[in-house]
Each structure stands twice: as structure tokens, then as C-alpha cells.
């Protein structure tokens, strides 16, 4: 198959005109648009509707009647979705997870996408582990092709170890980028894309000025044994 392209971006509640131009350009090449800190302005809704995306948002909070959270948009409609929140111990503003499932045309397979924004300001690793484990419990019902993507706030080795263990349990592996401009915090990369029963054909990152995170663009095809 020709494959499909996934854009993942923590867009930092993007709302200005240049940010919108970035998103318009990046999304025009993408079958799936996965945002963290998506800020559901009228402009963003117009852009998604104009491009005929089906989209869902797991709301973290509302500010001035505008919802913010993780948002997943796709060319095809999901046949299942599940979302939940994990409270930030210090700020009180929750982080959200959105899990969607898509029937893959021409096959009897389904693709599951987990769009994750992990909690940040918690020194207790059990909070971090609990949010990932809850996500993994939902995903573990699905045996087929899988993408786990987002801002994992994996800024220390303890968090990276928790993340790596759960990803391994799910039989997934991490995308390696040809050019790697992913955001780092305290020396660790925080944005990741993991996959299972798929083959990455191209994996790029792009430097932008409109967010403190750089977008990740990956083209996948189904693995032969999917």
C-alpha cells in the first residue's frame, strides 16, 4: 500500500496566524493530525472542517469558552473512541489521553491511535506510571496495528524507564527520525511516536517558531504480517 502520514505536534495552544499557516501546510500532507495542547478556536475548527477531517478532542480545560486538550483528526471516521484525564498534582489542570480506532480500507484490520499528553509536574513516578498503565489497559484489548504518540514529558531516566517498559509490554517500538529536532527538557526528549505492526517509510521533524515543540511527521504502511 502507499501508506499514510501522521503529523504529531504539541502545538502549544497555537492560535496566531503564523501558527495556523504552519498547521495548514503540515496537515495538508497528512492523513492523521495528532495535537497536544490543541486549542479549539473557531479558526482551528474552520481549518479542520475545510480539509474535511473527522476530529475529536479530549478536553483538559476551557478558557474563554475555548476548549483545550489533545485532538486527533483523520480522513476517516473512528468507530471507537475513549478518553480520560489525569490530574496534574501541582497545577490542577489535567492532562488528557484520547484513544481512537479506525477501520483500514481494503483490509479487515483496525488501526488504534493513542494521543497522549503525560502529566508533567509530579515528582512521584507512581502518578506517571498510573496514567500510562490506564492507557495500556485500554490498548491491550487491541492486537492489531497501533500508534502511541504524543508529549510524554519523559524528562528524566526514571520516566523513560517506565515508558520503555510499558511500550515493550505492548509489543511496540519507537520511531527513529532521519533528522531529529524534537523538543528536549532537562536533556531528555519528551515527544515520541511508537508503533506496532506497521513499517515506517519516512520519519521527519521540522523546526518551527510557533511552538516550543517541533512537529513530527511519519509515513507508515501496514506490516506484511499485520
Which residues does each predicted region cover?
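Loop/turn elements at helix/coil->beta-strand transitions in domains of secreted/extracellular proteins
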Residues: 2-4, 29-31, 52-53, 108-111, ...
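Active-site-proximal beta-strand elements of phosphoester/diester hydrolases
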Residues: 3-13, 82, 109-120
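Active-site metal-binding loops of divalent metal-dependent hydrolases
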Residues: 11, 38, 116-118, 150-152, ...
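Active-site neighborhood of phospho(di)ester-bond hydrolases with catalytic His/Asp-centered motifs
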Residues: 33-37, 56-59, 147-151, 174-179
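His/acidic metal-ligating clusters that form di-metal
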Residues: 99, 103-105, 110-112, 126-149, ...
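Metal-dependent phosphoester-hydrolase catalytic domains
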Residues: 101, 140-143, 152-226
Amino acid at each position: 500500500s502507499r501508506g499514510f502520514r501522521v503529523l504529531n505536534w504539541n502545538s502549544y495552544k497555537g492560535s496566531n496566524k503564523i501558527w495556523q499557516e504552519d498547521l495548514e501546510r503540515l496537515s495538508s500532507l497528512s492523513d492523521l493530525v495528532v495535537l497536544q495542547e490543541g486549542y479549539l478556536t473557531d479558526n482551528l475548527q474552520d481549518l479542520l472542517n475545510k480539509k474535511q477531517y473527522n476530529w475529536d478532542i479530549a478536553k483538559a480545560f476551557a478558557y474563554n469558552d475555548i476548549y483545550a486538550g489533545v485532538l486527533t483528526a483523520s480522513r476517516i471516521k473512528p468507530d471507537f473512541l475513549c478518553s480520560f484525564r489525569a490530574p496534574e498534582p501541582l497545577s490542577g489542570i489535567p492532562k488528557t489521553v484520547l484513544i481512537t480506532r479506525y477501520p483500514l480500507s481494503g483490509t479487515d484490520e483496525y488501526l488504534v491511535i493513542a494521543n497522549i499528553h503525560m502529566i508533567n509536574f509530579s515528582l512521584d513516578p507512581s502518578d506517571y506510571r498510573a496514567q500510562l498503565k490506564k492507557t495500556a489497559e485500554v490498548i491491550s484489548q487491541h492486537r492489531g496495528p497501533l500508534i502511541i504518540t504524543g508529549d510524554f514529558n519523559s524528562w528524566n531516566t526514571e520516566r523513560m524507564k517506565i515508558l520503555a517498559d510499558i511500550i515493550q509490554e505492548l509489543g511496540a517500538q519507537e520511531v527513529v527520525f532521519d533528522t531529529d529536532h524534537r523538543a528536549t527538557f532537562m536533556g531528555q526528549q519528551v515527544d515520541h511516536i511508537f508503533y506496532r505492526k506497521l513499517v515506517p517509510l519516512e520519519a521527519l521533524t521540522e523546526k518551527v517558531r510557533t511552538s516550543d515543540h517541533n512537529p513530527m511527521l511519519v509515513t507508515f504502511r501496514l506490516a506484511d504480517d499485520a
